[in-house]
A protein has these predicted regions:
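Soluble, non-membrane globular domain cores that form compact, hydrophobic packing
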Residues: 21-95, 101-176
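Positively charged n-region of N-terminal signal peptides that target proteins for export
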Residues: 1-5, 9-12
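C-terminal motif of bacterial Sec signal peptides marking the signal peptidase cleavage site
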Residues: 16-20
Length: 176
């Protein structure tokens, strides 16, 4: 009887041990900033004034050409919504894009595709050579700016403002 009880206890301990070892600790993803993307963009600009004349627009995710042109994404299958803020003067290479993904697990994948796919010379006569992508939860930020505008704004300053809006933590930052 004692052997049977000991066998059951040992098997129970082994099952618990195997179950605990089988579950890998997943990296906890932050909860992204809440609210409309345009409101998040406004909050970023409250933290870092660019001194540029800017316009913020919600992107039509069904228009794949506009999506690719502005975000570098070839399709919107992982995206819930997107907004862009750009200088009204086309000779100023500045663009801030926020994308909210459907599932925060896909944020870094979307961010990498944005980094690899965005055209930093989309303005033709100027190039945004200072580029960073950052993510917090389900929100991905891409900011690109011409380095000759560094006395006004840099991608690092916008990423830091986004970090502050996101509660002080970012899940990742990518750059070229």
């Amino acid at each position: 009887m004692l052997k049977r009880i000991m066998s059951i206890l040992i098997m129970g301990i082994m099952v618990i041990g195997m179950t605990a070892c089988g579950k890998a600790a997943e990296k906890e993803v932050s909860k992204g900033p809440e609210g409309e993307l345009s409101a998040i963009i406004d909050q970023i600009y409250e933290k870092k004034n660019t001194d540029l004349m800017l316009e913020t627009t919600k992107l039509d995710l069904t228009d794949t050409e506009i999506l690719k042109y502005n975000t570098g994404l070839s399709d919107a299958s992982l995206v819930k919504e997107a907004a862009i803020s750009e200088a009204l003067i086309s000779s100023q290479a500045y663009s801030l894009i926020l994308v909210r993904v459907k599932d925060s697990k896909d944020a870094k994948t979307v961010a990498q595709e944005m980094l690899d796919g965005v055209n930093q010379s989309k303005w033709i006569c100027v190039t945004a050579d200072d580029l960073k992508v950052a993510g917090c939860g389900d929100v991905v930020l891409l900011v690109m700016v011409a380095s000759n505008m560094s006395d006004t704004v840099t991608s690092e300053q916008i990423v830091e403002a986004f970090k502050a809006v996101a509660g002080g933590n970012l899940d990742f930052t990518l750059e070229k």
